[in-house]
Amino acid sequence: MNLAWKEIKFYRFRYTLIMLIIFLLGSMVLFISGLAQGLARENISYLNNMPAEHYIVEDNKEPKLESSQLNQSQQNKIEKIIHENATQMGTQTLKINQQDQDVITLNTPKHLTPKLVSGNYPKKQNEIAISEKLTGNDLKVGDTVTFKGHHHNYKISGIMNESMYSHSSMILMNKEAFKSLNKQVSTFYPVDKINKDNKESLKQIKGIKVVNEKALTDNIASYQAEQMPLNLMIISLFVITAIVLSAFFYVMTIQKIPQIGILKAIGIKTKHLLTALLLQIILTTMVGVILAFSVILILNAFMPVTMPFYLSYSQVLLMIVVFLIVGLIGALLSFIKVLKVDPIEAIGGME
């Protein structure tokens, strides 16, 4: 540790430069990762927060909640088996400050309602609970809104946490309000557990299918289209990080060959030199990534609620671990070089 720290202090400018590069790369990785997660949550946060493992939907080639049309006969048969009421969605356009915004209206059994950030669940026919993202349009509990093509005013009774599906904010309504507002609806059944007997019974109902959450998210076009390029960008940045660290530490090692030779000649073991190099890689990487995380955390605090950005601590921890692994991979050439240094050749004894 002492050897590693002394070397960092002696070559402070070089190590500051590599920390700055890691900081910039780390900031880019964390920001793009946060953007990817934020966009993902805008697509599937409703599904992620739903206490259900299975969904009973219309039997289509590509099952989607918004296109699940179950007739009354199918609903009656399903409800006799699972003893649950249906969840229904309807697409509407909300008028906000003279602007139109597409939203999804929702009516669902009480135990499946999204959690509230503030306010109360709608009880009256003229009350609604809105997704938290809509508060970015200066909406709050107590405000009234209208839907395009309708003249009724609806009072906001509550704000729901993370309630979005396919980039559309969700609006919770009671059964009567939902029916009076929506003429075209999609119907499905979120179910937590389905036993073997119920699965067999459901298979006998024509035109329905039991799917899991992944089957639904895979069929959200915007989810797949956004995640793939963003994840490729993150992978590319990790590759760039490995190349940069590899080049930096390899050049540093070549420049230090005479010193390494002298240290070996006076009895310093190779494992101590490798340990010093390892500690330098860990220290420079950790400092750069922690600084990047701090800056992104500060930026996140000032981002508006409408910005699709999200970073979890587990995600940040994973990024730090990946950066360390990438740094070690990038330093493999330096490790090999240190191992091969011959003290006599390094200090010019063979000339």
Swiss-Prot record:
Keyword ATP-binding: no
One matching Pfam family: FtsX
Intrachain disulfide bonds: none
Record bears the keyword Cell membrane: yes
Spans through the membrane: 16-36, 232-252, 278-298, 316-336
Source organism per UniProt: Staphylococcus haemolyticus (strain JCSC1435)
Name under which the protein is recorded: Putative hemin transport system permease protein HrtB
Main function: Part of the ABC transporter complex hrt involved in hemin import. Responsible for the translocation of the substrate across the membrane.
